[in-house]
Amino acid sequence: RIREFGIECDKKNGGISAATSVAKLREYEENREYKIKTYNYNNLELLDKNSVDKEIGSSLYYGGVLDKGAGHLHPIKYALGLVKAAEKLNVKLYERSVVTKINQTSHAVEVLTDRGMVKAKKIAVCCNAYIKGLNLGIENRIMPCATYIVCTEPLSQNLQREILPNDYCVSDTNFDLNYYRLSDSKRMIFGGAVGYSLKIVEGLKKRTKRQLNKVYPNLSELKIDYIWGGLIA
């Protein structure tokens, strides 16, 4: 869709799954073999410790897998690009319409909102953690939790050469997994610190910054310009 509709959203190719232990690296190796044999997916490159250190710019990991078919983008730019593309195709968009109930009838699905109702033959329920009361079948099978992100000031040119030189995104195998990438403006966007409250507190900011410093000690002096959180499931 990015190519089809010409959406400018800072798209970058390549994502690394980084292993925090030898056992986790072995799991990655097995998973890679499974995907190759089962799905004929050949975009996965196994990285040893030296290779993952070079690609990430951190000595924390034991190895990993580079998925050349994955990548990252600017989510708001992508969403707004989809909106423009949909409008050109005469799709009707109803913003700020809170869905209160979904009814399944013999002929259609009714989506009730605080501003009106939409009927369709089929719907896509794309709520992730924000599904409370709409579909118990899904709601009873997920567990909402909060995740938090810090965004640093822009990196210096020297740091840009050391950290993520190929602009890949990264996630690791921590129980509270870390996930991070560089923005188009070369800020480090670093997420993690899973919790169960959306309240942003100073201690949380310090905790997330501490995780960032563990992965990248050379970023310890960087100022945190932004912090935010949200629910995932």
Predicted regions span which residues?
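Preference for short coil/turn "hinge" residues that link or interrupt alpha-helices
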Residues: 37-40, 66, 86, 92, ...
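Helical element adjacent to the flavin cofactor pocket in flavoenzyme catalytic cores
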Residues: 26, 30-34, 59-122, 126
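Active-site substrate-recognition segment that forms the wall
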Residues: 1-12, 99-101, 106, 116-233
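General small-molecule cofactor/ligand-binding pocket signal
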Residues: 10, 44-47, 92-94, 223-227
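Flavin (FAD/FMN) cofactor-binding and adjacent substrate-gating region
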Residues: 3-81
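A generic structural signal for alpha->beta connector loops
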Residues: 6, 40-43, 90, 108, ...
